[in-house]
Amino acid sequence: LRKEIKTAVIGAIIIIAAIGGISAFFTSLDKTAQSASNQILLEKQGPTNNTTGKLISYPDENNFPVAPDLVGIADYINTTPQELKSEMKDKVVLYDFWTYSCINCIRTLPYLKAWNDKYADKGLLIIGVHSPEFEFEKDPNNVKMAAQKYGLTYPIVLDSDHMTWDAFSNRYWPAEYITDDLGHIRHTHFGEGEYDTTEKVIQQLLDQRATRLGLNMTADQTLVNLQEHQFSAIQTPELYFGYDFMQDRNFLGNSEGLQPEKIVSYTIPSGLQNDHFYLDGQWQNLNDSMKLVSDNGKIVLPYSAKDVHIVASGTGDNIQVLLDGNVVTSDDAGQDLKNGTASISDHRLYNIISSKQQGSHTVTIIAHPGFQIYTFTFG
């Protein structure tokens, strides 16, 4: 009996040891895999120099993905297909995904223009990839007028069907993708801001390009500083009017609510909520906008911002704009507002309020039949 017990004990010890060994083996595998995974993440991110804050040359550029080709391009501005293909060879390329009625995109343009002026002769090529948000933004003439208005001289391609957008798996306006001179995507940034970081990447990649091509040049290490274009996140978010755009972001304050493709009679309630817009009059609910059909109509919006813009179109009639119930003075008037009114015709962004300082106010728009509004945006 004692022998049997002894044998059983020895057997149990062997089994426990085996289980422990197997557990240790798999734990070791898990740690090895985790270590390898972390190493891959570190390599993908690329090392940094903590002293200077500047990115260090990546040891194996082939681990970065190669940028997709520009596909499905409907038209070209400031270039031709042949010229652009030739220009892209051996260049550091910054792809800027934008659309001309997007205020966030527009606020990025001064930096792109400054970088183009500063680094184009050092090997930087900026390509504006115009991927429209609204149907009217597909019109090449509208994009050409916007490029002229904002003084854009670098190549712009019209990605009207979002084929290049999809090739990059992009989902944002604006979005920047920067490739080295071999075509690898080395940096991405979505939205506004972090301009210093983006410019440091440009400088680093230009220096790497010069070394690789045996060029005796170094990128200017100073940074573009455009304080007037710095973005403040403490403000009312962009507000959409089309029912297709309001999913999960419906800021219509009227109790009548959205009624797709119907003409709805709206009445402004007594209590107004911040960052919500309220309608008065008869408005047609469209997929990307709302259109006034009654003789008179009104939009009231309590907001927090310095600047107020609308993406709108109309028949050329004037809208009247009030700020906190009063006619807008010259101190608060936007670029498109004169004597408290603005003529609305072309599909575009209109700047109606531009105050000296950011604050909380209520803007009122009084409009006439044919006025069509897509978004409120703020700055």
Provide a role label for each language-model segment.
Residues R2-Y76, P81-Q82, D196-G379:
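Non-globular targeting/processing and membrane-anchoring segments
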Residues I73, F97-T99, V129-P132, D159-D161, ...:
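Active-site-proximal beta-strand/loop segments in catalytic clefts of secreted hydrolases
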Residues P81-Q82, I106-T108, K138-P140, A167-S169, ...:
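Short, solvent-exposed loop/turn and secondary-structure capping segments
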Residues Q82-I106, L112, L125-I127:
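Short active-site neighborhood of thiol/selenol oxidoreductases, capturing the structured segment around
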Residues K89-V93, D121-L125, G151-P155, W173, ...:
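Loop/turn elements at helix/coil->beta-strand transitions in domains of secreted/extracellular proteins
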Residues I106-K149, S160-W165:
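Structural microenvironment flanking redox-active thiols in thiol-disulfide oxidoreductases
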Residues N141-T179, I310:
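Short, internal strand/loop/helix patches
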Residues N170-A210:
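Non-catalytic, surface beta->alpha helical segment in thiol-disulfide oxidoreductase systems
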